[in-house]
């Protein structure tokens, strides 16, 4: 398994802002407007509720300090209570409404992924990188908590923190500016450290994919009935179990290294949190003892100073979390944009005509599978004339299936050309070309249907 190579440490193809623009585009094209309207409203309401909670107690204390009438005190308490109840109800309602837009965007991306897999060029199905990206794209959108949907949650939390940060900054504008700068500086350092450490998983994603793929293969062999006879006859049970356990130990070691790296991000953040909160508390206590700060203002500034640090930390922490999610979504986008070696919609149209005879010719065709040391087919010339019946006979591995795949356009030759009525098939729309053939290969899968429907591949 490769570790420490350039391959495992490649940078993401798309950054946070490019992924954000991409996700907004997916939502816009799918007309999922609620991710914009409801998401923004939810952020405003959530921040507003926190601000109202901050102002509640200082407002009551201020009324008591100034010796106002009981009616004024009850009015303040009643007004804030009604406001908080309304904001809480609105927050719960918007949270529920926001679920549908996020899920619809995720379903759209899952649909795009499924269409990519179903309609991709056949050589991509032999490409290890394509298969790895496909598996990662599935994991990134398989549940509501994965990156494709959690992306919107993170952006909502960032907007909430930005609104709260602006409001608290206004409240603290009368305090020492150096205190605010200290809070911001320590939070920025924490964010940068967390961002660098949280990229560890992305930099080693190829290594993780190798472990996951091997585990999936061993599980398939151990549970698939078609391998049961060989496992029992040759006594392979202990070997399969040992292979599973050894791979699981390697994967466990990988996870331990990953979580150890992530732990350092939390340690750094905790140390900086102690520094910035300690400085804020010390300054407020000095104002109270030396300048006689009123109790209501002390409580307001005390809560605002604590909250200000939390808003700043929240902004940067959520950006770090969003950055990590965007790494996963970058993988999804790389999969969806994986290059196609064949031409489809951009190829020349090829009309199927029942009154037109078709001749297939292989002209000096060679084919070598990726990673192979020699050609499976070498310098082959073959002509299949209209109406001609041919039988291809050969040993296992001689290239019979490969030859048929070349004729059917599932593979392009490494050298030479495949000609249809004298024309190279590569410029054509490959899907139009496929409509000319009906190939039955030795691979099969039995559907949960009648024998007739399995043979006909349709309902009769």
Would you name each region that the model predicts?
Residues 36-93, 169-201, 275-282, 286-296, ...:
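Transmembrane helix-loop-helix hairpins at lipid-water interfaces of multipass membrane proteins
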Residues 2-11, 113-143, 208-242, 334-347, ...:
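Short intracellular "coupling" helices and adjacent cytoplasmic loop segments at the cytosolic face
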